[in-house]
Design a protein with these regions (language model features):
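Contiguous surface segments at macromolecular interaction interfaces
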Residues: 214-227
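Double-stranded beta-helix
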Residues: 178-215
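Eukaryotic N-terminal low-complexity, Ser/Thr- and Lys/Arg-rich leader segments
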Residues: 1-6, 224-227
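Non-heme Fe(II) oxygenase catalytic core, chiefly the N-lobe of the double-stranded beta-helix
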Residues: 4-19, 24-156, 162-193
Length: 227
């Protein structure tokens, strides 16, 4: 218990000061490779098992519950390399506050640069081609934010403040976003095809934590209205 508490203290300090924290995990690279080999079947029984394993990882859950009174998983996509472009999921610096946290699950061989402390500054941004916010290097220079380069030959996990700037130089990250209730209320739901098996999977996932919800909905039938 003491080591877990210490690790949580270290993670919280890193998130506050640097904007990100890397978790050691020797399994994630192989699990992502399996996911890729299957064609990234997110909304299947296999996909939800993958989601449950990592989205509710005990270490991630501890950080989320330490950061938020309540939050929900509201975004689950894969982001590929985009060298030469620094992006963030949320802008606004201190004015926006920490209301969204991101988990990057890095595939083997991925390389990324995280811009240390950039979450603490309000900067001019523009919309990137994949609907994130792009931060000009001139703005990062203005606030004195320098890149911390991370290589993941075997894959890896990083949890970060959604306001933090990052550049995916090589590879890709399967990405989870968790947001507070007031933020998630404005997000579209993740719509899953209806099946009894998937409903049961989601129900089991919802039992993992009373403080981390799922912004999921099911189609009534193929092409039907989500509920």
């Amino acid at each position: 218990m003491a080591s877990t508490t210490f690790a949580l203290d270290v993670a919280e300090k890193a998130l506050l000061e640097h904007g990100f924290f890397a978790l050691d995990d020797s399994l994630v690279g192989d699990r992502i490779w399996e996911m890729e080999e299957r064609g990234f079947p997110y909304f299947t029984e296999y996909g939800l098992d993958f989601c449950r394993q990592f989205a509710f990882d005990q270490r991630i859950r501890s950080i989320l519950e330490n950061s938020f009174e309540k939050c929900s998983l509201g975004h689950w996509l894969r982001y590929e390399e985009f060298p030469g472009h620094v992006e963030c999921f949320r802008r606004g610096g201190p004015r926006a506050g920490r209301r969204v946290l991101v988990v990057h699950l890095w595939a083997k061989g991925s390389q990324v640069a995280y811009y240390v402390g950039s979450h603490l500054h309000e900067m001019a941004t523009s919309r990137s081609r994949r609907s994130l916010y792009e931060i000009p290097l001139s703005e990062l220079d203005r606030v004195g934010s320098k890149p911390k380069h991370k290589d993941f030959p075997d894959g890896g996990i990083v949890i970060l403040d959604a306001r933090l700037g990052f550049e995916i130089k090589e590879g890709y990250a399967i990405t989870f976003l968790y947001a507070t209730d007031e933020v998630i209320a404005n997000w579209a739901k993740i719509v899953l095809p209806y099946s009894k098996a998937l409903v049961e999977k989601v129900s089991d996932m919802e039992k993992e934590s009373t403080r981390i919800g799922l912004n999921f909905a099911f189609e009534v039938s193929p092409g039907g209205k989500a509920t």
